[in-house]
Design a protein with these regions (language model features):
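Short Gly/Pro-enriched turn/cap motifs at secondary-structure boundaries
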Residues: 67-68, 110, 323-328, 400-404, ...
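Sec-dependent signal peptide recognition
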Residues: 2-7
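Active-site segment of extracytoplasmic enzymes that catalyze sulfate/phosphate-ester chemistry
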Residues: 35-126, 146, 150, 156, ...
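Active-site-proximal cap/lid insertion segments
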Residues: 23, 30-46, 92-94, 141, ...
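Bacterial Sec-dependent signal peptides at the C-terminal "C-region" and cleavage site
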Residues: 11-22
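Low-complexity, glycine/alanine/valine/leucine- and proline-rich hydrophobic stretches
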Residues: 410-425
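Structural recognition of the beta-strand scaffold that forms the well-ordered cores
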Residues: 26-29, 60-66, 71-72, 77-80, ...
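Polar, surface-exposed loop/tail segments
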Residues: 49, 78, 133, 288-291, ...
Length: 474
């Protein structure tokens, strides 16, 4: 079976005939898109026909996990194939929260010593491009120094000042997103990032390319074209007014339970249109037979906040909590891979993580694996080609920080169907069987103490292995 897969990949990536060029890769990263925020993953409120069609063409991962519940750490794992705790990038860069513990220190940039996935493709003769959100360091650590020959609308900011041109906010370095050449007043950022990406694909149509389109959407501020918002306003009105019953408490925070935010829905629609335009350009250029498209989010949807504002972006039900938390709502996310030659319409249920994309994309492209670099990732190529997945393995999370969502310093491990969450303030922990309790409502610590002890021991062993920084008493 392995030989069959290798032969298929060789046909695609290297070519057994002159007419088979190397595989192009388009990696589309969405910011804060929740697990159930698209039609193919179960939403009935958001409309995502192009994303749904992409999944129908390829593989949909139903148990994909982001490496962190916040953006910068997950993005670091995508670029390196390493766990954020190993890189010591465990918080969103710039994040600071006060609490009972002194939060752990963390790195504020992606080290240049890492061989990024951009460098891996560039060093194999690919044209490389990075468009959109970076959030992995300031000047001196930007993507043009990390393997990407072409970049656009990239800086250290985690969100724009506005999604309508001009995008930057000179009064806040966190939202200082540069404008694009050719912008007109009111240009919508999601559309413009797509325009630039299409130009990159067009320019490099006759050579192998690796493009990362990293949308700022659907991160706050929640803004979208008025006519699209109006349509979803009507759709939300049909659901009836939002009330206290559509929220539940999560410790000191509040979690939204119903998808009904019209502006957020309009932002998702714009992102879906971006995916459709990318796929159509690839088809128009006649390169679809040697171009893979990967669609992924960097963490769960923003459903949980400290303040009860009735303005959370989305709901992740049946998952618990959202962005910032190590419950499923914060770390389970969509992943779709459409690769030429792979079976269409696959639903892959094996637990996987952001760290896996680096070796996966190398193998799909027929490039040499770099196991000393992607230490914490395993290739999913066999699963994508319908030939079995990786062996069962534990997945780990480490978040030694406080977050505006209400989460506190914590760690987690999933091993098989069992998942344990450890709270660093008081040393408490919770155990859930995800096969029977996806919403993490029934804590099994009292019923299965041996399993809890086994998972806790493995989580603590792993933290020692990767040198994870811990919070300290004040």
């Amino acid at each position: 079976m392995k030989k069959t897969l290798l032969f298929a990949l060789a046909l695609i990536a290297v070519g057994c005939a002159e007419s088979t060029p190397p595989l192009n890769v388009v990696l589309i990263v969405i910011d804060d898109l929740g697990w159930i925020d698209t039609g193919v993953y179960g939403s009935s409120f958001y409309e995502t026909p192009h994303i749904d069609q992409l999944a129908a063409r390829g593989a949909r991962f139903s148990q994909f996990y982001t490496a962190s519940a916040v953006c910068s750490p997950t993005r670091a794992s995508l670029m390196t194939g390493k766990h954020p705790a190993r890189l010591d990038i465990t918080n969103w860069i710039g994040g600071e929260q006060n609490g009972l513990l002194q939060q752990a220190t963390y790195e504020r940039q992606l080290p240049l010593e890492e061989t990024t996935i951009g460098e891996a493709f560039r060093d194999n003769g690919y044209a490389t491009g990075y468009v959109g959100k970076w959030h992995l360091g300031r000047e001196g650590f930007m993507p043009e120094l990390q393997g990407f020959d072409f970049t656009a609308t990239v800086n250290h900011a985690g969100q724009p000042g506005s999604y309508f041109s001009p995008y930057g906010n000179e009064n806040s370095p966190r939202t200082a997103v540069p404008d694009l050449e050719g912008d007109s007043a009111g240009s919508y950022l999601t559309d413009r990032l797509t325009d630039v990406s299409l130009d990159f694909i067009e320019r490099n149509r006759d050579q192998p390319f690796f493009l990362t389109l990293s949308h700022y959407s659907v991160h706050t501020p929640l803004q979208a074209p008025e006519e699209t918002v109006a349509r979803y306003d009507r759709k939300a009105a049909a659901l009836g007014p939002e009330t206290e019953e559509h929220y539940e408490s999560e410790r000191d925070a509040s979690t939204k339970l119903r998808q009904d935010h019209a502006t957020y829905a309009a932002m998702i629609e714009s992102t879906d249109e971006s995916v459709g335009r990318i796929v159509e350009k690839i088809r128009e250029l006649g390169i679809e037979e040697h171009t893979a498209v990967v669609f992924v989010s960097d963490n769960g949807g923003l459903s949980t906040l400290m303040r009860r504002s009735f303005n959370q972006a989305t709901a992740n039900m049946p998952l618990r909590a959202g962005k910032g938390w190590l419950y499923e709502g914060g770390i389970r996310a969509p992943l779709i891979v459409a690769a030429p030659g792979a079976p269409a319409g696959l639903d892959i249920a094996q637990p996987t993580t952001s760290n896996d994309l680096y070796p996966t994309l190398l193998e799909l492209a027929g490039l040499t694996q770099m196991p000393e670099q992607h230490l914490d990732g395993e290739s999913l190529a066999s699963a994508i080609f319908g030939q079995g997945g990786t062996a069962e393995r534990p997945l780990y999370w480490h978040f030694p920080h406080y977050h505006g969502s209400g989460n506190r310093p914590s760690g987690a491990i999933r091993w098989g169907d069992l998942k344990l969450i450890e709270w660093f303030e008081d040393g408490g922990f919770e155990l859930y069987d995800l096969s029977a309790d996806l919403g993490e409502r029934r804590d099994l610590v009292g019923e299965r103490p041996e399993d809890a002890a086994r998972l806790l021991s493995e989580l603590q062993r792993w933290r020692g292995e990767v040198g994870a920084n811990m919070p300290t008493p004040r």
